[in-house]
């Protein structure tokens, strides 16, 4: 699919106020973000976290604050569990969403520990038989097209442009970007990992490199 020029906000009848923006780095904002997730935004979390359309508001959005220590995993977990206990059996659908959220907090710790135990995953493949599977060098134009969201694949490009503009993207779409780069473009995961690490507001090495290798 041939790429067109990126339209301006005026062309799309959008005001600058409607453009996505980065999250504000404050502890008070971290706590309020978690609370709005627990009290309202997260009601359909387990059903809406996979879509790039609904995930923007239905996901917790506290990952940047966890990465920079403005709120801890323990604190987020305790607040979430306290709120879940208050629900009781009154809302099974919402309780399921909170359980899904709590499990992801545990995964957060699991992957960080994995890097502590095996720091080589940042630079070497988890399974040595896959080393040198893809060339370490690539056509720079191909890599640039992927990095800038100009591959010609609408879904891929939309997600990459959104990430580049906001610094955030939901997990399923992150996985899609990596798998597309690895299998369709046959790019080495170390090349793509660097760009994504620079874009993610919530970059956390332990999670990042484990997921990059799993998806590639």
Language model regions located:
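A contiguous catalytic/ligand-binding core that recognizes phosphate-bearing ligands
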Residues: 103, 111-165, 169, 176
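Hydrophobic alpha-helix feature that most strongly marks membrane-spanning transmembrane helices
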Residues: 81, 85, 110, 116, ...
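Glycine/tryptophan-enriched, flexible segments
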Residues: 1-131
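Contiguous, well-ordered alpha-helical segments that form the cores/surfaces of helical PPI scaffolds
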Residues: 63, 141-144, 154-164, 174-184, ...
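Flexible loop/turn segments at secondary-structure boundaries
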Residues: 74, 113, 121-123, 183-188, ...
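C-terminal, helix-dominated tail/subdomain
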Residues: 130, 134-137, 147, 195-216
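Active-site capping/gating regions of soluble enzymes
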Residues: 191
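Secondary-structure capping and boundary motifs in well-ordered enzyme cores
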Residues: 54, 58, 64-68, 72, ...
């Amino acid at each position: 699919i041939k790429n067109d020029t990126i339209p301006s906000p005026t062309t799309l009848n959008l005001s600058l106020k409607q453009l996505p923006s980065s999250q504000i780095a404050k502890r008070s904002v971290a706590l309020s973000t978690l609370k709005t997730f627990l009290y309202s935004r997260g009601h359909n979390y387990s059903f809406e976290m996979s879509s790039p359309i609904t995930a923007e508001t239905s996901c917790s959005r506290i990952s940047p604050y966890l990465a920079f220590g403005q709120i801890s995993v323990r604190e987020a977990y305790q607040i979430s569990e306290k709120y879940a206990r208050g629900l009781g059996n009154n809302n099974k659908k919402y309780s399921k969403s909170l359980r899904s959220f709590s499990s992801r907090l545990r995964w957060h710790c699991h992957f960080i520990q994995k890097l502590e135990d095996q720091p080589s995953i940042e630079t070497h493949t988890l399974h040595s038989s896959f080393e040198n599977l893809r060339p370490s060098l690539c056509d720079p134009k191909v890599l640039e097209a992927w990095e800038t969201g100009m591959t010609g694949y609408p879904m891929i490009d939309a997600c990459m442009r959104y990430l580049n503009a906001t610094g955030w993207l939901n997990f399923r779409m992150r996985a899609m970007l990596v798998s597309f780069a690895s299998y369709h473009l046959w790019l080495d995961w170390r090349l793509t990992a660097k760009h994504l690490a620079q874009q993610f507001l919530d970059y956390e090495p332990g999670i990042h490199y484990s997921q990059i290798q799993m998806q590639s």
